[in-house]
Amino acid sequence: MLKMANLRLEFWDKDVEDKFIALKVEAYYDIIKELLFAHLYKNGYNCTNHLCLIAYLKEKIKDFDFEIQKVDELRKVRNEISYRGLTIKKDYFERNELEFKNIIQRLKEEANSIQ
């Protein structure tokens, strides 16, 4: 899971045309989701849905409340993109990209700290 998350991050860590912003937002959610699953599996847990991942985050990662809200918001945005064809404005992405990257970094650190 960590390898796939890193591969996705490497692929999407570049500027894209505005018409691809929704795909990049989806990709950030997928990267975060894969890192969460890696964390889950390393702790011996399994999860069957995205809400379970959010609940796991709340329980297991301390001092992460704002980030958890941002991940849940991203989950909802990703669902709107995937299931309703929502288009994403560039300013949404620009306002949130740094936070997405910070969440990814923290999740990588958390996953790597598990023995």
Residue ranges and their predicted role:
Residues M1-Q115:
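Terminal alpha-helical segments
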